[in-house]
A protein has these predicted regions:
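Short, mixed-charge aromatic SLiMs
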Residues: 51-60, 101-106, 188-200
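Short terminal or interdomain "cap/linker" segment that borders an active site or interface and mediates
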Residues: 2-25, 128-166, 170, 174-204
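N-terminal low-complexity or simple alpha-helical regulatory segments
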Residues: 2-101
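Amphipathic interaction/junction segments at domain boundaries or subunit interfaces
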Residues: 62-164, 181-182, 188
Length: 204
């Protein structure tokens, strides 16, 4: 269900800014592309305006895909997309999926891996290439029982990002497995008192 009155406050933006960690510009650009597809150029301009209101004096047009920027900025753009486009949890989930779909670096690379297991084992390395905050742990993959477990440790920005990551990880799994019938569930969450985020991916 949409939260019609959802609005990011300057206090929330300042709290995010104090959390350390960086992300590649390619991720931010992918999220801005989602905003453009859903709300057009006007929605992107509104995000730029709101960023300045919240104390982020950065030109979105100057973001380079291979440069690193604060993860707080990336998260704030996702929150502002929710605010401006009136997104629900499903919309945030789809934004996460699109982040992989429009990436000119990650999705094509994943398609080269013949073995889903090898890609699963390399997942922590890809996380480190994209994000300089937290870590991804490839816990277990059982190809016979058709499930995999991954954990994200040391990452706590905003509860909505759990839905974003679910969408991203689901798209990764569908790309690697070459299957459409894939499901994902977050079974542990730091915002619910757990020590890390844990996701179970199942497929048929």
């Amino acid at each position: 269900m949409q939260e019609e009155n959802f609005k990011v406050t300057r206090k929330e933006a300042q709290q995010l800014a104090r959390i350390p960690g960086n992300v590649k510009g390619a991720v931010i650009l992918a999220n801005l592309e989602y905003v453009r597809q859903k709300g057009g150029k006007k929605a992107q301009e509104m995000i730029q305006k709101r960023l300045k209101e919240l104390g982020y004096d950065i030109s979105l047009q100057d973001i380079k895909p291979m440069n690193f920027y604060p993860e707080a900025l990336s998260v704030l753009i996702i929150l502002l997309a929710k605010e401006i486009l009136k997104l629900d949890k499903a919309g945030i989930f789809e934004m996460g999926r699109l982040a992989l779909k429009v990436s000119i670096f990650v999705e094509p690379l994943l398609r080269f891996f013949v073995s889903p297991l090898k890609c699963f084992q390399q997942a922590p390395r890809y996380w480190k290439k994209q994000l300089k905050v937290g870590e991804l742990e490839a816990v277990k993959m059982d190809e016979e029982k058709k499930y995999a477990i991954i954990r994200v440790k040391g990452y706590k920005f905003h509860p909505l990002i759990c839905d974003y990551h679910k969408g991203y990880f689901l798209q990764v799994a569908q790309t690697v497995l070459g299957k459409k019938n894939v499901e994902i569930e977050e079974t542990k969450c730091v915002f619910k008192g757990d020590p890390y985020h844990e996701y179970i991916i199942r497929w048929q």
